């Protein structure tokens, strides 16, 4: 059997809602599908094989009788089948963490057949799940993970990431807009790679979890793909890592955009959610930056909120762009996320190719 593109998909919290009370789906009343999971799987099924992989603590014991599991589980499968969605395999670990078994995710014994017989294509297979253990499972399998989240990475976004094909020659203008920038100092060792004309799965690892998520928001909302890796002096603080990634990313974007012929050049967005974020961008060739925001705490996770301004200032400097950013709101997490999303959306407008003209009366940018 040849290697196949495969999605190893978690069940509770990914395909169906996981109750936060007891984390067990043991009745039909608790069965609730995640939003748009069925339309997404219908789009994905022609490209990928589906394998369900799930930890079910104490399944078959008094704390979780088999019959209590079977009824909602079989109902879930019946709904999927009625819509044309089939799982090639369903792999379940019934053990609790304290049992120290070899099959509980993120361990890989459940998937031994797929590993030994090389049944999945490592270059085009993914683990989809809502927990860090799903991400670790992907690492143990040598493939990539998509950590599902109903707001930050929902099923619509997952389907878009997995199905967006590379655009080898956008608008017939020649080479694809791609760049690689490596930057090494005493404090950081960074590599940034961007593909402006394709979207897909971004591989980002800076050692700062919240920052990784924010960088992914730029690419996702910008409609492009990027890989970012950084080893920095986080034992001191996060300053050098965030600043140097911004400098490298700005340089990579500038290089990928190239001579700017045919681009829109300008972008402006004003998204309204619980926060009001405003972003205006001009790929002018002249760096200028203005920022207005107040945060009510010093940290979001392991990310210093004061570094938000410094990140965008640094990216404007190496991108050679005029950038205005502001946000109003009460929640620092939401404020910062709104800024990164707004920047991504604005960048999406500015780098879009519409013709072959130089967007400047001077004839050069």
Swiss-Prot record:
**Binding positions (Mg(2+)):** 10, 12, 130
Name the cofactor(s): Mg(2+); Zn(2+)
Q: Got a GO cellular component term for this one?
A: cytoplasm
Q: Which Enzyme Commission number(s) are on file for it? A: 3.1.3.15, 4.2.1.19
Q: Which GO terms describe its biological process?
A: L-histidine biosynthetic process
Q: In which residues is Zn(2+) bound?
A: 93, 95, 101, 103
Which PROSITE patterns does the entry link to?
Answer: IGP_DEHYDRATASE_1, IGP_DEHYDRATASE_2
Q: Where is this region: Imidazoleglycerol-phosphate dehydratase?
A: 177-365
The pathway to which it is assigned is: Amino-acid biosynthesis; L-histidine biosynthesis; L-histidine from 5-phospho-alpha-D-ribose 1-diphosphate: step 6/9; Amino-acid biosynthesis; L-histidine biosynthesis; L-histidine from 5-phospho-alpha-D-ribose 1-diphosphate: step 8/9
* Predominant localisation class: cytoplasm
Q: Which SUPFAM superfamilies match?
A: HAD-like, Ribosomal protein S5 domain 2-like
Catalytic reaction list: D-erythro-1-(imidazol-4-yl)glycerol 3-phosphate = 3-(imidazol-4-yl)-2-oxopropyl phosphate + H2O; L-histidinol phosphate + H2O = L-histidinol + phosphate
Alphabetical UniProt keywords: Amino-acid biosynthesis, Cytoplasm, Histidine biosynthesis, Hydrolase, Lyase, Magnesium, Metal-binding, Multifunctional enzyme, Zinc
Q: HAMAP family under this entry?
A: Bifunc_HisB (MF_01022), HisB (MF_00076)
Q: Write out the similarity annotation.
A: In the N-terminal section; belongs to the histidinol-phosphatase family.
Designated name of the protein? Histidine biosynthesis bifunctional protein HisB
What is the scientific name of the source organism? Mannheimia succiniciproducens (strain KCTC 0769BP / MBEL55E)
């Amino acid at each position: 059997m040849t290697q196949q593109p495969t999605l190893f998909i978690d069940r509770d919290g990914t395909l169906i809602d996981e109750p936060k009370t007891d984390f067990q789906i043991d009745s039909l009343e608790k069965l609730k599908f995640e939003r748009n999971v069925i339309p997404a799987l219908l789009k994905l099924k022609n490209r990928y094989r589906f394998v369900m992989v799930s930890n079910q603590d104490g399944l078959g014991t008094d704390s979780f009788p088999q019959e209590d599991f079977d009824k909602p589980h079989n109902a879930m499968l019946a709904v999927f089948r009625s819509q044309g969605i089939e799982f090639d395999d369903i792999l379940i670990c019934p053990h609790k963490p304290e049992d120290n078994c070899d099959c509980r995710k993120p361990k890989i014994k459940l998937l031994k057949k797929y590993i030994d017989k090389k049944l999945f294509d490592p270059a085009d297979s993914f683990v989809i799940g809502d927990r860090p253990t799903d991400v670790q499972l992907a690492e143990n399998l040598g493939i990539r993970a998509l950590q599902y989240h109903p707001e930050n990475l929902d099923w619509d976004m997952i389907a878009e990431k997995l199905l967006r094909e590379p655009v080898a020659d956008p608008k017939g203008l020649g080479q694809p807009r791609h760049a690689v920038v490596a930057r090494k100092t005493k404090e950081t060792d960074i590599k940034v790679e961007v593909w402006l004309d394709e979207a897909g799965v971004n591989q980002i690892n800076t050692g700062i979890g919240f920052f990784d998520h924010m960088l992914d928001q730029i690419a996702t909302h910008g409609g492009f793909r990027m890989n970012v890796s950084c080893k920095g002096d986080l034992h001191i603080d996060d300053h050098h890592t965030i600043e140097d990634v911004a400098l490298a990313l700005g340089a990579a974007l500038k290089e990928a955009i190239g001579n700017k012929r045919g681009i829109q050049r300008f972008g402006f967005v004003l998204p309204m959610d619980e926060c009001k974020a405003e972003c205006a961008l001009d790929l002018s060739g002249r760096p200028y930056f203005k920022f207005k925001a107040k945060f009510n705490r010093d940290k979001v996770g392991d990310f210093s909120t004061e570094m938000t301004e410094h990140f965008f200032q640094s990216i404007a400097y190496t991108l050679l762009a005029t950038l205005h950013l502001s946000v109003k709101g009460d929640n620092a997490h939401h404020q910062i996320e709104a800024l990164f999303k707004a920047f991504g959306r604005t960048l999406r407008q500015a780098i879009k190719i519409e013709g072959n003209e130089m967007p400047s009366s001077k004839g050069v940018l």
